[in-house]
Amino acid sequence: MANLVKTFLLGELVKGMGVTLKNFFARKDTIYFPEEKTPQSVRFRGLHAQRRYPNGEERCIACKLCEAVCPAMAINIESEEREDGTRRTKRYDIDLTKCIFCGFCEEACPTDAIVETHIFEYHGEKKGDLHMTKPILLAIGDKYEAEIAKRKAADAPYR
């Protein structure tokens, strides 16, 4: 009998309309993406960059730890020895089509040379556009050095 009354009075429909009306006037959780940006964690892992020392010299010492630890094998490094006996990279490439943005390269680097920035809005129109070379990585690092240093400092107490 109760089932017949529920069916006759359309109980489920009334319940559903109640939920709809309750949520209709509630605060919206939608973020209108291009105009509004969501806050990012200081540990967000986006586009890669290479850093320099304050005197302008690149930080990478060609230890190849990042290349060894990369699970996707997205990093390729060729190094050469300088006249003063130090080693530096001749070629440093990251293939972003292979990269899984795990952050292992950043963790393995003893000199903080390779970092993942906050940049997530990038694209490639041609096949080679997502193949990052050493000059491109250094240019990104130079452009965003202040932000990279600020994020590193904010994350330092937790490392």
Curated annotation (Swiss-Prot):
It holds the Pfam family Fer4_7. PROSITE patterns: 4FE4S_FER_1, 4FE4S_FER_2. Keywords: 4Fe-4S, Cell inner membrane, Cell membrane, Iron, Iron-sulfur, Membrane, Metal-binding, NAD, Quinone, Repeat, Translocase, Ubiquinone. It catalyses: a quinone + NADH + 5 H(+)(in) = a quinol + NAD(+) + 4 H(+)(out). [4Fe-4S] cluster 1 binds at residues 60, 63, 66, 109. Disulfide bonds: none annotated. [4Fe-4S] cluster 2 binds at residues 70, 99, 102, 105. Binds 2 [4Fe-4S] clusters per subunit. GO terms for molecular function: 4 iron, 4 sulfur cluster binding; iron ion binding; NADH:ubiquinone reductase (non-electrogenic) activity; quinone binding. It comes from the Bacteria. One of its GO terms (cellular component) is plasma membrane. NDH-1 is composed of 14 different subunits. Subunits NuoA, H, J, K, L, M, N constitute the membrane sector of the complex. Belongs to the complex I 23 kDa subunit family. NDH-1 shuttles electrons from NADH, via FMN and iron-sulfur (Fe-S) centers, to quinones in the respiratory chain. The immediate electron acceptor for the enzyme in this species is believed to be ubiquinone. Couples the redox reaction to proton translocation (for every two electrons transferred, four hydrogen ions are translocated across the cytoplasmic membrane), and thus conserves the redox energy in a proton gradient. This is NADH-quinone oxidoreductase subunit I. It comes from Neisseria gonorrhoeae (strain ATCC 700825 / FA 1090).
